[in-house]
Amino acid sequence: MNPYGNIRKVPLDYEGIKSTAYAVQRQELDNRRGLEWKECGIVGSNYLLVPNSEVKELADEIATESQLTWEPMKTFFNGKQFAYFMQCKSDTTEIAKDDDIALGMAFWNSYDGSTALQFRTFLVRLVCTNGMITKDFMNLMKFKHNKTSEGYEKQIINAAKVVDNCGDDVEAVAKRMRRMVETPVSLNDLAVLRNSTLGHLPVTLWGKISTHFLQKESSKILDNDVTMWDFYNACTDILWHDEKPTMASLEHNQVITDKLLGAMA
């Protein structure tokens, strides 16, 4: 599925009666039928349709003009929602020995109005390339898909200048992560987490995370040497490297990150 194919907004009508709604269509190549238009959302007449290709071009421009060195990391697209992630390759921050994090920046968009056009910064654990998405502890700027966001390009470029001055934010989050390294976790603690802080997680997702955690850290658990940092990384392992990622994967990543970082005050 090509996230950068052509898109258009087509007025809807019924038996000659025009509607105020519009269909958003994206062009996709079918192996048998060739190029065809597929509907990916219904929006209002004032909906500002922003092509993913423009969002990526904007991201690449910001990366080029930044004082830091960036490279593409990950692209998500499900036909309607889009996210483009980049990782800083020039600066790192230590959490524990041989365990560093780096700054990331992300750009989100949607063709059906379900996700705001947005710029955000996040963090990357280098040893496993896990992305750690947060709304509460890093930068986030959203733009509505309407006329109030016309000229969004300049607004995002100005907002994204913060990437060159994120050192204090990164260090503040790093301090909380170092507290995770120092916070022991028992199986009883996991039960408490499940019934309180992470009680919102779907049963299937909790099962995947807890199974992965228990298998990955089995020897450390037997030695009572497992930490909140170990558990948190089991969460981001599952969510960031999901073979069939969804927008929910990114949203759960954000909520878990904010909940666990928030507990490390």
Task: Kindly give the residue locations of the regions a language model identified.
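Intrinsically disordered, low-complexity regions enriched in serine/threonine
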Residues: 1-18, 74, 89-265
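Feature for intrinsically disordered/low-complexity regulatory segments and propeptides
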Residues: 1-58, 243
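A broad "ordered helical/assembly scaffold" signature
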Residues: 42-43, 78, 160-162
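Glycine-rich, compositionally biased intrinsically disordered regions
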Residues: 52-69, 73
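Beta-rich nucleic-acid/ligand-interaction surfaces
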Residues: 70-91
